[in-house]
């Protein structure tokens, strides 16, 4: 359980509570609030999507022995309507009050059992504006999710990879695709993340914000190092904006996952913010292919003096919920090796996701087998 704010210490790879105790973060992702175009699942959009969360998770996460959760949300759900420019030159934002009330409920429910929450600003295929995209893990999605549709008025369906690459490159370069009809994209997203951080500035259940899920681009945006520098600049700007309204939060900055770019890691320095946590995701075929990446991320974390967190993994496809699952035949041994390495080296972790543990969604391996393995790896 987690009670109260957490923090980092410059030069240390640990996370601490207010009493100075080291707190290993071991948890799971509870997703579902990232889907849709501002609408709840009870009123699905044309792709059948909408936001919602499995309510059984409120009790199960604590009962299973985890101490925190990562909850993917989306800027598109927070702000489905574009901001309005006032006569005085300032922007008025139109936040989704129904969605915010749902986040309040979720925060309250997990807070009752002392489960810390890191809200993740998720994206897959950039935005719901990008439809029928060739998404790499799940074999294609009717629509993406993440950034709001109004950022991308000129996207047509079916979406192509070059369109998504250009959109992400423009985003991290703070180049607008809507002209003066909205703030520059990073500034617009800053407003959303600041709003959420301020909303929970006195609520210690919300322990952090994951500032951008799985950033990526390709050579059209520059060399891997140049793209990594763009990411560092973005995280610095976003983290400083969040800290202006809430200095308690852990600020998570992610590398691109292996496979989304030709190389990973690409970052050569951390963002210039306090309470930063370095994060990576692992969706490789097995432990042998994962280990070089994990070691590289760990090396960076130690060099920079920041904690490191494996923010997503699915036990080498044991928990895959998509159409093209490729289960590692040695998934148990490989997952144990992965988590043993993490625990031995102080790498925090969060399994993805609750849907393959506490719902009826089909997975290649029975849910109880996955859960038992994860529980066996929770540090005492």
Question: Which residues does each predicted region cover?
Answer:
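Active-site mouth of glycoside hydrolases
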Residues: 5-250, 255-265
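Glycan-binding loop/region signatures in secreted carbohydrate-active enzymes
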Residues: 25-50, 277-279, 301, 357-373
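Substrate-binding cleft of secreted/luminal carbohydrate-active enzymes
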Residues: 26, 287, 291-380
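Short amphipathic alpha-helical segments and helix-helix/interface helices
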Residues: 58, 107, 239, 266-268, ...
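A structural micro-motif
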Residues: 115, 204, 249-250, 274-276, ...
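Structural detector of well-ordered beta-strand residues that form the stable sheet scaffold
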Residues: 118, 252, 277-279, 309, ...
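Aromatic- and acid-rich polysaccharide-binding/catalytic face
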Residues: 207, 265-289, 307
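Short, catalytically relevant binding-site loops at active-site mouths
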Residues: 257-260, 283-286, 315
């Amino acid at each position: 359980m987690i009670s109260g704010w957490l923090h980092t210490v410059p030069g240390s790879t640990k996370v601490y509570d207010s009493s100075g105790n080291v707190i290993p973060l071991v948890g799971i992702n509870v997703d579902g609030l990232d889907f849709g175009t501002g609408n709840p699942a009870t009123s699905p959009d044309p792709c059948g999507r909408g936001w919602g969360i499995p309510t059984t998770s409120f009790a199960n996460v604590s009962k299973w022995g985890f101490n925190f959760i990562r909850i993917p949300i989306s800027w598109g759900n927070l702000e489905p309507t574009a901001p309005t420019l006032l006569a005085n030159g300032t922007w008025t934002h139109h936040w989704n009050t129904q969605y915010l009330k749902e986040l309040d409920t979720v925060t309250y429910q997990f807070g009752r059992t002392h489960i810390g929450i890191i809200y993740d600003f998720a994206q897959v295929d950039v935005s719901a504006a990008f439809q029928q995209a060739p998404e790499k893990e799940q074999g294609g999605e009717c629509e993406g999710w993440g950034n709001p549709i109004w950022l991308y008025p000129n996207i047509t369906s079916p979406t192509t990879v070059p369109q998504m690459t250009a959109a992400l490159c423009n985003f991290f370069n703070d180049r607008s695709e809507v002209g003066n009809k909205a703030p520059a994209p990073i500034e617009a997203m800053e407003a959303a993340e600041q709003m959420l951080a301020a909303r929970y500035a006195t609520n210690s259940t919300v322990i952090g914000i994951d500032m951008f899920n799985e950033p990526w681009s390709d050579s059209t945006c520059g060399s891997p190092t140049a793209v990594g520098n763009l990411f560092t600049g973005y995280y610095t700007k976003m983290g400083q904006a969040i800290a202006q309204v809430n200095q308690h939060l852990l600020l998570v900055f992610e590398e691109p996952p292996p496979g989304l770019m030709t190389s990973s890691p690409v970052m050569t320095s951390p963002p210039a913010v306090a309470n930063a946590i370095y994060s990576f995701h692992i969706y490789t075929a097995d432990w042998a292919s994962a280990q070089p990446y994990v070691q590289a991320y760990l090396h960076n974390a130690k060099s920079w003096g920041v904690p490191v967190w494996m923010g997503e993994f699915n036990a080498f496809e044991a928990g895959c919920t998509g159409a093209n699952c490729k289960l590692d035949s040695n998934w148990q041994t490989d997952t144990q090796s992965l988590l043993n390495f993490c625990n031995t080296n102080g790498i925090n972790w969060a399994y993805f996701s609750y849907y393959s543990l506490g719902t009826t969604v089909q997975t290649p391996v029975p849910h109880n087998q996955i859960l038992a393995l994860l529980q066996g790896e929770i540090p005492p």
